[in-house]
Amino acid sequence: MSTSHDRAVLNQILNPLMPTSDSGIAEIHLESDSLEHPGYELSLQLEREGVALAEGVRLDEAIEKFTKALEVCPKNPSAYNNRAQAYRLQNKPEKALDDLNEALSLAGPKTKTACQAYVQRASIYRLRGDDDKARTDFASAAELGSSFAKMQLVALNPYAAMCNKMLAEVFEKAKTGED
């Protein structure tokens, strides 16, 4: 039977980039985007409609809704972030990067939108083979609490990957009784 301390130590070994806390779970509270702009509420409504269209794989229509949301409120970082996602799904990474850069310039530093935009931008960089830029953005998203970003950082770290592989082999041998 393992103690909570044992589990915390093992968790830190297996997940070296995960933040530690007394409970083993980091609590990060991200701020919501909120703007004092006359068109912000309408922009949010149009954005929700765009998300529904994107979920139905009606990407052209979704992009139109996100664009309308931005016409109503050009300072809405979430609309840029969501339009970037639709562009990514259409395999238009340049347009997605433009929107993600704009979302990050408008979003507060500790917002859900910033976290999502960092993950999206890092994913594009990773697909392009630009691991340094991907690592930087995944690290920013990880600091904001993204568990996906934390896993990607481990995957991008060759030493952590090697350590995880060796530990997996040790545990497998221990389960099967091998020396």
Swiss-Prot record:
The keyword Hydrolase does not apply. One of its GO terms (biological process) is tyrosine metabolic process. TPR repeats lie at residues 43-76, 78-110, 115-148. The keyword Transferase does not apply. Keywords: Repeat, TPR repeat. It holds the Pfam family TPR_11. Disulfide bonds: none annotated. Belongs to the TTC36 family. This is Tetratricopeptide repeat protein 36. The gene is ttc-36.
